[in-house]
């Protein structure tokens, strides 16, 4: 594809400590603010690509732990994705690149485990709800956004709703 994925990284001082905000570590239980990314926004607006014209802000499911049942966690995640969608739109990006790969070091977003305190059926319903909230937040900021993913279809197929077949599959809750 004739495009490029751009990772946005910013940092600021909070209570005497340097805190970093990175688009590939977007699943955080903290609501990011637009002004945190002012420098990146200005830089991206200044770009005038002639050859690489389909550019995407890179995101990743890598930062855990994830909690499907925490309303505050998902409000923050949706806020952060809406913010990245807004920045993508305002800076002429085509959209967001979603890295959904199962990195073993952080706990995977779409994994099901009975340890989460819910049945597979309840967890799947909650994941669907969170998916709707997520896409609504993104769509509100950038209605005609392009979402690009490396593994979108291959993660979901083949899937089974038979809990005995799921085990610890990393994509059991993938919508």
Show where each model-derived region lies.
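Glycan-processing catalytic domains of CAZymes
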Residues: 1-175
């Amino acid at each position: 594809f004739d495009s490029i994925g751009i990772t946005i990284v910013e940092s600021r001082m909070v209570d005497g400590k340097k805190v970093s905000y990175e688009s590939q570590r977007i699943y955080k239980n903290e609501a990011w603010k637009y002004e945190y990314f002012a420098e990146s926004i200005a830089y991206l607006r200044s770009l005038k690509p002639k050859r690489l014209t389909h550019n995407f802000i890179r995101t990743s499911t890598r930062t855990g732990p994830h909690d499907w049942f925490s309303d505050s966690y998902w409000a923050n995640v949706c806020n952060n994705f809406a913010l990245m969608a807004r920045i993508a739109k305002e800076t002429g990006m085509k959209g967001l690149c979603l890295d959904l790969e199962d990195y073993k070091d952080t706990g995977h977003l779409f994994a099901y485990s009975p340890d989460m305190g819910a049945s597979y059926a309840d967890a799947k319903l909650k994941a669907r709800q969170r998916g709707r909230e997520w896409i609504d937040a993104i769509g509100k900021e950038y209605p005609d956004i392009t979402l690009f993913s490396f593994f979108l279809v291959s993660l979901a197929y083949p899937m089974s709703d038979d809990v005995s077949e799921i085990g610890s599959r990393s994509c059991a809750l993938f919508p």
